C-alpha cells in the first residue's frame, strides 16, 4: 500500500476526515501533509511522518481510501 496525494484518511477517535495534500522527501524520511476537516470547523493542516501514518493505518487508527 502506498500513500499518494489526493488519498483520504479517516480517524475514528476524533471523526476527522483528512486529504493528503502532498508527500515531501526529507532527509529524515518522507513527510505527508494532511488537511483535516471537521464538520462545522475550519480545516487545519498537519505534517506527519510517512512511517507513522502507515503504522496508524496498519493498526486500524486511520482508514485509508486511495484517490483512484
Predicted segments — roles?
Residues 32-36:
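SH3/SH3-like beta-barrel fold
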